[in-house]
């Protein structure tokens, strides 16, 4: 590989980068993990600071960050963290679902102050899933935690979307892809 080409592979673990910055756009194309979340937050904060500096220099300039998301989901807590970061931005954030935006990736999508779905793109929301083994009391405790997470997810979707309660319950029963149309 010529030295002037940007390497796509991380030298440490041979994984593809999932976050790219192009102009005022961030592209998150990958699994929602703690590591990818940290990579995104670093790129997002750098871009946010850069745009805020432009705002200070240019009268009337209102910065905007466009976040393109293509992800089949991943870690629920990493998804919550991404949503929180976007919501707390000092710059307007437009989230755009590209391709598939599923599961925990939809939390990131909801973090935008403006949300769009690309042509031929789909969203998927569903019940949480978990794995566990252990003693009966541990299983009961895990079920209580899952019940709380489901209530919190419902509250989050109800606050951020116009999905009626009946439709939300239907969506939670079976995996259905949603499009802009």
Segments from the language model and where they lie:
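Terminal-region recognition feature
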Residues: 1-181
